[in-house]
Swiss-Prot record:
Pathway: Isoprenoid biosynthesis; isopentenyl diphosphate biosynthesis via DXP pathway; isopentenyl diphosphate from 1-deoxy-D-xylulose 5-phosphate: step 4/6. This is 2-C-methyl-D-erythritol 2,4-cyclodiphosphate synthase. It comes from the Bacteria. Belongs to the IspF family. It comes from Chloroherpeton thalassium (strain ATCC 35110 / GB-78). GO terms for biological process: isopentenyl diphosphate biosynthetic process, methylerythritol 4-phosphate pathway; terpenoid biosynthetic process. InterPro entries: MECDP_synthase, MECDP_synthase_CS, MECDP_synthase_sf. Coiled coil: none annotated. GO terms for molecular function: 2-C-methyl-D-erythritol 2,4-cyclodiphosphate synthase activity; metal ion binding. Its EC number is 4.6.1.12. The gene is ispF. Involved in the biosynthesis of isopentenyl diphosphate (IPP) and dimethylallyl diphosphate (DMAPP), two major building blocks of isoprenoid compounds. Catalyzes the conversion of 4-diphosphocytidyl-2-C-methyl-D-erythritol 2-phosphate (CDP-ME2P) to 2-C-methyl-D-erythritol 2,4-cyclodiphosphate (ME-CPP) with a corresponding release of cytidine 5-monophosphate (CMP). A divalent metal cation binds at D8, H10, H42. The record marks H34, T133 as: Transition state stabilizer. The lineage of its organism: Bacteria, Pseudomonadati, Chlorobiota, Chlorobiia, Chlorobiales.
């Protein structure tokens, strides 16, 4: 078994959809990025890649490649799962934490868990998504961005 950790951050801006955990969340701002900027799925992807010592999402999905412009990060996470498989690993579980001042994430957590589980081909009980605010401290607390942390466990197939 191997453990991985991932972190991602994206700026909140007007004129973008807010997509977290593969869920489009109604809000006046969205996350800025080359892809759909799904901060949670990016952190999870990095955790999985790191656990298998396969680099990070920037290596596999560079923001200079037009093929990834606006791409659904669920497709990226599915590709990460396939990469793990080709290297003899499969995901066991994921624990993640999202820091975001607004909007409230709780109503969307179950769907996020289901999306992540489907991408990784694991049971939804193997996926944890938690969210908290930053108590109005720092860039997250001022509503300027969102931050996600993820820890995963993978095992040999």
């Amino acid at each position: 078994m191997r453990i991985g950790i991932g972190i991602d951050i994206h700026q909140l801006v007007e004129g973008r959809k807010l997509i977290i955990g593969g869920v489009e969340i109604p809000y006046e701002k969205g996350l800025k990025g080359h892809s759909d900027a799904d901060v949670l799925l990016h952190a999870i992807s990095d955790a999985l890649l790191g656990a298998a010592a396969l680099g990070d999402i920037g290596k596999h999905f560079p923001d200079t490649d037009p093929a990834y412009k606006g791409i659904d990060s669920q497709l990226l996470l599915k590709h990460v799962r396939k990469l793990l498989e080709t290297h003899g690993y499969k995901p066991v579980n994921v624990d993640s934490m999202l820091l975001l001042e607004k909007p409230k994430i709780a109503p969307h957590v179950q769907k996020m868990r289901e999306n992540i589980a489907a991408c990784l081909e694991v049971d939804v009980d193997a996926i944890s998504v938690k969210a908290t605010t930053n108590e109005k401290i720092g860039y997250v607390g001022r509503g300027e961005g969102a931050l996600a942390h993820a820890v995963c466990l993978i095992e040999k197939i």
